Each structure stands twice: as C-alpha cells, then as structure tokens.
Amino acid sequence: SDVYKRQPLIAAGGIASGKAMLAAMILGAEGVQIGSRFAVATESSAHPNFKQQVWKTPEGGTMLALKKIAPTRLIKNEFYEQVKTLEDQGADSDTLKELLGKGRAKQGIFEGNLAEGELEIGQIASMLKGEESVAEIMQDLLRDYNQSINRCSNSVSF
C-alpha cells in the first residue's frame, strides 16, 4: 500500500550487531534503533555502577516487567523482585505507578543504586562485556554489517 511506502520502518529491540542490522533490513526495515549498546558507551551519562551491572548480566538475567503500564525489560534486582511480587499478586496499574513514581529509573541508571533502582536494559545485555566509545561501536557495527552483506552475496546462488 502507498501508506507503507511513505512511512519509514525502523526496527528496534535486540539489535546489537551489524548482522542483526542486516537481518532487519532484509525483513524490510529502512533503519534500526540501537539502545542498550549505546546506553553503556563511554559517552553515556549512565552511572558506572549501572554500566558494570549491565556488563555482568548473564543470559536470562533480564525479565520483562511492568506489563500493565509499559512493558519494560529489567535486570533482576531487589526492585525487580518488588515489581514481580506485586504483579504476581495482581496489582493494578496505579499501584505499580506508585512504586515507579519514586524516581526508580533515575536511582538505578543515573545514580547507580543497584538494589532499589530500576535497571532498565534490553535483552541483549548479556552480549555487552565492556565499555566502548560511540566511535568504536559504530566501527564495529559497520564492519560486521559489511562482512554480513558479503557473506550473504557470496553464498546465494541459483
């Protein structure tokens, strides 16, 4: 339809490599949004404690929570456990908003409170192992993207 041709499609979520960028483009995206990898970049204003926690997060160390408000992926910590307990008990959105209304994201991400703060990060957290500058991230993404294109073009035949 003409409506879809006029609107750019941007893929987001789970994209941390050039290979994932290419996959999104092959599926029709015109661009990608990369959040988590840049959230812990050298230039990021995130607290060093938050960055360290992200780099230590194992596969399966994040969970989707706050589904009644806005689905949010969190690193498992004391705050996450409070949210999970309330959700398991059937808490309504007002109760969850009250818990969030205490500046939890600021506490966790920007003040480095790893226990009581909201530690929001994407599901690719376990892939992130150390600090990189934005320039290094971009170079790696483009190198991997171009290598992936070359692999695809060299392996397709009819």
In which residue ranges do the predicted regions lie?
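Conserved active-site-proximal phosphate/metal-binding subdomains
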Residues: S1, K5-I10, A16-F158
